[in-house]
Curated annotation (Swiss-Prot):
GO terms for cellular component: cytosol. Coiled coil: none annotated. It is found in: Cytoplasm. InterPro entries: Uncharacterised_CoxE (IPR008912), Uncharacterised_ViaA (IPR023481), VWF_A (IPR002035), vWFA_dom_sf (IPR036465). Component of the RavA-ViaA chaperone complex, which may act on the membrane to optimize the function of some of the respiratory chains. ViaA stimulates the ATPase activity of RavA. Its main location: cytoplasm. Belongs to the ViaA family. The gene is viaA. Homodimer. Interacts with RavA. This is Regulatory protein ViaA. Gene3D superfamilies: von Willebrand factor, type A domain. Keywords: Chaperone, Cytoplasm.
Length: 483
C-alpha cells in the first residue's frame, strides 16, 4: 500500500509548512499561554522539546498509509500520464468508470470536461490531467491535515498532562531553568494525579521545615568552592563541633574510684547492706573512693575560632553525584521518617539544579535502591516516598553497599550521605578501614545527617561532616518558636 510520504513526493506536496503551522497553533493555544505565564521557567523546557515534536509529526506522516481508494486513483493517474492522446481517448471510458467507482472528488469535473467538448484535443488532454493532478493534491493535503489534526489533539492532551504534573512539582523540585528542563523531561512518564500528590505532600512538609531545606542546601553545595583567606582581612567568629574523650555510656573500659551510684560494682553495693560497714560505705562515697565501672567514649563540644571575613581566589571544586543511604529502622519512624524523606527530596532538588545524579539506598535488613535523577526519577521518587520505616538497623550493610558502588568509574567523585539516628551497633573494622581508604586516596566525602542527639560517637567518627537535625520534641518546639 502507498505511504503518505511517497504520495507527497509524487505530487510535490510539502508537509513542512503544515507541520510548522500546526506547531504554532499548538503554542498559541490558551492552555499553553496561561501555563507559560504561571510557570515561566518551564517555558524554555517546553520550547526545547519542539524539535522532538516536529520529528514525531514527520515520522507519523512518513509512516501513514494512504487509503486504498486514493492509492488506486493515483496509480491510474500515473498510468494515464504515459498515454498519448489517441490512447487516452480509448481508455477514457474506463478512467471515468474508475473515478465513479472510487467516489473521487474529480468525477463530476471529469464528466463535464468530456461532455462539453465534442472533440477531445491534445490541449483538452493536458487540461484533464492538470485538473486531475490538482484534485489529487487537494486530497493529499486534506489527508495530511487530518492526520496532523489527530496528532495535534493527542499531543495537546499529552502536553496538558505533563504541564499539570510539572506545574504541581515545579515549586518543590525546580530551583532553576536546568532543573525545570529535567523535570519536564521526567514528566513524560505515565503518572496519575494520585501518584505525584505524594511528592506535593512532602514538598509542603519541606516548606514547613525551612531549617531542613537549608541543611540540604548547605550539604549539597558544601563542595562548591574553596576559598583562600586574604591578608589583613577582618575576622569573624566561626563555630565547629569537635570530638574529645568523655565519660559517656558507650563502652566499659575498666574500673575507677568515684561516687557514681548507678555504676557501682556489686561488692561495693553489698557493703551497704552490712550494718558494721554502712558508715564506711558513706565515708568512701563522700570521698569518691567507691569502685565503679569506668565507661569511656567520645563527646562533642563547640569550638569557637576566628577566620577572615573577606576571601579571594575561589577555586571551583567538582560536584559529583549523591549516594544517599536512609535508615529505615523502627526508631526512624514517625516524624524522623517524614524528615528523612523530605531531606532526600531536597537533595533531589539540588541534584536537578546542578545536573548531578541522586541515588537513594534504603538500609534495614535488605538494601533497596532508587535513582531520583534518571528519566524515571519521578516514578522512583514516588516509590521511595511510599516506603515505610519498620525494619531493623544494619548500618554495616549500608556502608558496604556504598563502598561497592563507589568502585565504579561513574561514581569516582561521589559524596555519600547517611541519614540515621545512629543508634546502632559499632561498625566492623574492615568497613571502617575501607571508608578511610576511600576518604584518603580517592577524596570521597562521607556526610552524616543525624536525626537524634543520642547517636553513638563511635559510629559517627568516620564521617567527614556531621549535620545535625534533632527531631526531639524540645528541638522542634524551639525551631517553631524561632520562626
Amino acid at each position: 500500500m502507498l505511504t503518505l510520504d511517497t504520495l507527497n513526493t509524487m505530487l510535490a506536496v510539502s508537509e513542512e509548512g503544515m507541520v510548522e503551522e500546526m506547531i504554532l497553533a499548538l503554542l498559541a493555544s490558551p492552555q499553553l499561554v496561561i501555563f507559560f505565564e504561571k510557570f515561566p521557567r518551564l517555558k524554555n523546557a517546553v520550547t526545547a522539546d519542539l524539535p522532538r515534536w516536529r520529528e514525531a509529526l514527520r515520522s507519523r506522516l512518513k509512516d501513514a498509509r494512504v487509503p486504498p481508494e486514493l492509492t488506486e486513483e493515483v496509480m491510474c493517474y500515473q498510468q494515464s500520464q504515459l498515454l498519448s492522446t489517441p490512447q487516452f481517448i480509448v481508455q477514457l471510458p474506463q478512467i471515468l468508470a474508475l473515478l465513479h467507482r472510487l467516489h473521487s472528488p474529480y468525477t463530476a469535473q471529469a464528466k463535464q470536461l468530456t461532455e462539453s467538448n465534442s472533440t477531445f484535443t491534445p490541449a483538452l488532454h493536458t487540461l484533464f490531467l492538470q485538473r486531475w493532478r490538482l484534485s489529487l493534491v487537494v486530497q493529499a493535503t486534506t489527508l495530511n491535515q487530518q492526520l496532523l489534526e489527530e496528532e495535534r489533539e493527542q499531543l495537546l492532551s499529552d502536553v496538558q498532562e505533563r504541564m499539570t504534573l510539572s506545574g504541581q512539582l515545579e515549586p518543590t523540585l525546580a530551583e532553576n531553568d536546568n532543573a525545570a528542563g529535567r523535570l519536564w523531561d521526567m514528566s513524560a512518564g505515565q503518572l496519575k494525579r494520585g501518584d505525584y500528590q505524594l511528592i506535593v505532600k512532602y514538598g509542603e512538609f519541606l516548606a514547613a521545615q525551612p531549617e531542613l531545606m537549608q541543611l540540604a542546601e548547605q550539604l549539597g553545595r558544601s563542595r562548591e568552592a574553596k576559598s583562600v583567606p586574604k591578608k589583613d582581612a577582618p575576622m569573624e567568629t566561626f563555630r565547629t563541633l569537635v570530638r574529645e574523650p568523655a565519660t559517656v555510656p558507650e563502652q566499659v573500659d575498666g574500673i575507677q574510684q568515684g561516687d557514681d551510684i548507678l555504676r557501682l560494682l556489686p561488692p561495693e553495693l553489698a557493703t551497704l547492706g552490712i550494718t558494721e560497714l554502712e558508715y564506711e560505705f558513706y565515708r568512701r562515697l563522700v570521698e569518691k573512693q567507691l569502685l565503679t565501672y569506668r565507661l569511656h567514649g567520645e563527646a562533642w563540644r563547640e569550638k569557637v575560632t576566628e577566620r577572615p571575613v573577606v576571601h579571594q581566589d575561589v577555586d571551583e571544586q567538582p560536584r559529583g553525584p549523591f549516594i544517599v543511604c536512609v535508615d529505615t529502622s523502627g526508631s526512624m519512624g514517625g516524624f524522623n521518617e517524614q524528615c528523612a524523606k523530605a531531606f532526600c527530596l531536597a537533595l533531589m532538588r539540588v541534584a536537578l539544579a546542578d545536573n548531578r545524579r541522586c541515588f537513594i539506598m534504603l538500609f534495614s535488613t535488605d538494601v533497596v535502591r532508587y535513582e531520583l535523577s534518571g528519566p524515571e526519577g519521578i516514578e522512583q521518587a514516588i516509590r521511595f516516598l511510599s516506603q515505610r520505616f519498620r525494619g531493623g538497623t544494619d548500618i554495616a550493610s549500608c556502608f558496604r553497599a556504598i563502598i561497592e558502588r563507589m568502585q565504579g568509574r561513574e561514581w569516582f567523585d561521589a559524596d555519600a550521605v547517611v541519614i540515621s539516628d545512629f543508634i546502632a551497633q559499632r561498625l566492623p573494622d574492615d568497613v571502617v578501614s575501607k571508608v578511610g581508604e576511600l576518604q584518603r586516596l580517592h577524596q570521597h566525602r562521607f556526610h552524616a545527617v543525624a536525626m537524634s542527639a543520642h547517636g553513638k560517637p563511635g559510629i559517627m567518627r568516620i564521617f567527614d561532616h556531621i549535620w545535625r537535625f534533632d527531631t526531639g520534641m524540645r528541638s522542634r518546639l524551639l525551631r517553631r518558636w524561632r520562626r
